[in-house]
């Protein structure tokens, strides 16, 4: 029996080695074919430059290109002319994450001639479930480098340009000017306004998308890309959202979560819209009114479309009364961070109202009587929780209407519906509050004190600093890092 198991293990090892070698050979073949194609093009160009003559090819594409792109070229709405337009196109993708990865993947596969990627982040393990260009071995590598490595293996023909930094107002105009179309694949309002403003001022159409949890949105903006003041141009991001959302209402994927197929769907739709814009260049787009596409994975139907108005007559960027200029963008006088606002980490409690995770770990080890309240949402509480902790989600606390509890023994007890009676009445037990990162828990500590649960300071109501992120660092290294 042991001999058979050993033989099976040996065969699996040999098969894995053979598959790895085959993959390596296929990659080398693709690279060699791409190099040969580029060398032939350079040789022809050099010969033409030397003789002063232009050699006319029988066909507008190389043979390998017909084989690679043939299935999309026989689509009636696309055809040979569509392929030629893609080959000559230059697309800039801002953000090499959940949206940018699938968008870049399909645009590279379709044969877009030049693809630029802008991102200053590095690959993290938490990216891999949705950012499909990055692989486990590239954790820690710059995202643009990781993405281009994958794209070159997929299709060596396009030119790939890496912009290895976050987009800034000073650099944005100089980067954008060399491209025909911009894709906004970012996840924060300040960058979205910067991208839209720069695209409008440089006359570039923009495909913008977003995704969070199980929902996504998509818009094609500044299409057609007419100068500011021209009412026939497509609306910009400011036309749709003249004012940014309150900074404290903006939820990131890290905080709100995201399903990989949801953001993947939106990225693929961005690529589809980009191809439509690029292949219709020079043609009228009046027949396609601006709209907002909304995707909801758990709804039926999953897709809805909302018609958008044309350019706002008082838009700060694309109207005749525009106040935002390329110079104001470059110089920084248009402060996007100030315009959108920022949320600083919560620091609303005094040092006496907070303890470190390691200090609470000592309390836990000593077996002291206490209440530990976990204010994460239930879905997070179900992933991991401390023994004997009570889950009271922050959203439940904020959404509930209540009157302050009466703790006087001579009056009937009136408690908030979300507060367990034992927490209110077991005044001999201190209350410890914890959350994911140490911000929500501070708010809840303040709320519990407003309700009088600290009995005028006689009963400790304490926040655990840094939440479970710090708990993992200081107490339990095996705590799930999600």
From Swiss-Prot:
Region feature Disordered, mapped onto this chain: 33-57
Record-listed E.C. numbers: 2.7.7.80, 2.8.1.11
Cofactor(s), by name: Zn(2+)
Pfam family name, one: ThiF
Entry keyword Aminoacyl-tRNA synthetase: no
Chief place where the protein resides: cytoplasm
GO cellular component, one term: cytoplasm
GO MF terms held by the record: ATP binding; metal ion binding; molybdopterin-synthase adenylyltransferase activity; molybdopterin-synthase sulfurtransferase activity; nucleotidyltransferase activity; thiosulfate-cyanide sulfurtransferase activity; URM1 activating enzyme activity
Impact upon substituting residue 130 to Q: In cnxF200; impairs molybdopterin biosynthesis
Disulfide bond sites: none
Cofactor: binding details: Binds 1 zinc ion per subunit.
Binding positions (Zn(2+)): 236, 239, 315, 318
Domain Rhodanese: 366-480
Positions of transmembrane segments: none
Residues reported in the UniProt entry to bind ATP: 98, 119, 126-130, 143, 187-188
Catalytic reaction annotation: [molybdopterin-synthase sulfur-carrier protein]-C-terminal Gly-Gly + ATP + H(+) = [molybdopterin-synthase sulfur-carrier protein]-C-terminal Gly-Gly-AMP + diphosphate; [molybdopterin-synthase sulfur-carrier protein]-C-terminal Gly-Gly-AMP + S-sulfanyl-L-cysteinyl-[cysteine desulfurase] + AH2 = [molybdopterin-synthase sulfur-carrier protein]-C-terminal-Gly-aminoethanethioate + L-cysteinyl-[cysteine desulfurase] + A + AMP + 2 H(+)
One GO-annotated biological process of the protein: Mo-molybdopterin cofactor biosynthetic process
Domain of life from the UniProt record: Eukaryota
Uppermost EC category: transferase
Entry keyword set: ATP-binding, Cytoplasm, Metal-binding, Molybdenum cofactor biosynthesis, Multifunctional enzyme, Nucleotide-binding, Nucleotidyltransferase, Transferase, tRNA processing, Ubl conjugation pathway, Zinc
Family recorded in the similarity comment: In the N-terminal section; belongs to the HesA/MoeB/ThiF family. UBA4 subfamily.
PANTHER family, per database record: ADENYLYLTRANSFERASE AND SULFURTRANSFERASE MOCS3, UBIQUITIN-ACTIVATING ENZYME E1
Function: Plays a central role in 2-thiolation of mcm(5)S(2)U at tRNA wobble positions of cytosolic tRNA(Lys), tRNA(Glu) and tRNA(Gln). Also essential during biosynthesis of the molybdenum cofactor. Acts by mediating the C-terminal thiocarboxylation of sulfur carriers urm1 and mocs2a. Its N-terminus first activates urm1 and mocs2a as acyl-adenylates (-COAMP), then the persulfide sulfur on the catalytic cysteine is transferred to urm1 and mocs2a to form thiocarboxylation (-COSH) of their C-terminus.
Designated name of the protein: Adenylyltransferase and sulfurtransferase uba4
Organism: Emericella nidulans (strain FGSC A4 / ATCC 38163 / CBS 112.46 / NRRL 194 / M139) (Aspergillus nidulans)
